[in-house]
């Protein structure tokens, strides 16, 4: 993406930022919009069930809220203030949000997924976010931060089992799960 918002094919990114998706010369921007578009095409987002769509949307927006908290916690580059911000994130904010997610998973008695009995874009969004949060890449966020959350860990296992996820992991990271 060039500074003026042009993509390599000459089209303009609507907000002059990534991500964008080019479908036959039509450009879509914003992670949620792209996820819903692809989700509808792939069966990971409901086409005709507005209730399930709203349930999925609330999870995606929760992931955005969590991501925002992580971003805020990393803004201060002064070492001691950054460490304090990350400590608050890891001991206060993230556990609160993880419990919200745990409660939503408990409400779905049909499966280990957030909505219905099959994987959706909500599950994928949380799976990737949780992978990052527990990766050790974020100073001050322990890699075992998810240990207390049984349902979240079951969700992660279910997502890891999906053949397309394994295919993506192999292609992206050179390893299967």
Which residue ranges define each predicted feature?
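GST superfamily/GST-like fold recognition
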Residues: 56, 114-141, 147-153, 159, ...
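GST-like domain detector, emphasizing the conserved glutathione-binding G-site
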Residues: 1-98, 107-109, 118
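Short amphipathic alpha-helical interaction/hinge segments
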Residues: 67-74, 132, 137, 167
């Amino acid at each position: 993406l060039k500074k003026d918002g042009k993509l390599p094919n000459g089209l303009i990114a609507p907000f002059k930022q990534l991500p964008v998706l080019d479908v036959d010369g039509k450009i879509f921007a914003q992670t949620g919009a792209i996820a819903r578009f692809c989700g509808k095409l792939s069966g990971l987002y409901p086409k005709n069930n507005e209730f399930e769509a709203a349930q999925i949307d609330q999870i995606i927006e929760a992931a955005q809220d969590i991501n925002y908290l992580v971003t805020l916690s990393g803004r201060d580059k002064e070492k001691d203030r950054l460490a304090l911000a990350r400590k608050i994130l890891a001991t206060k904010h993230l556990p609160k949000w993880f419990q919200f997610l745990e409660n939503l998973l408990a409400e779905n008695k049909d499966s280990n997924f957030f909505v219905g009995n099959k994987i959706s874009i909500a599950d994928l969004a949380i799976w990737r976010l949780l992978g990052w949060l527990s990766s050790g890449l974020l100073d001050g966020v322990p890699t075992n931060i998810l240990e207390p959350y049984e349902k979240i860990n079951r969700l992660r296992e279910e997502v890891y089992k999906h053949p397309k996820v394994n295919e993506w992991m192999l292609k992206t990271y050179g390893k299967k799960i």
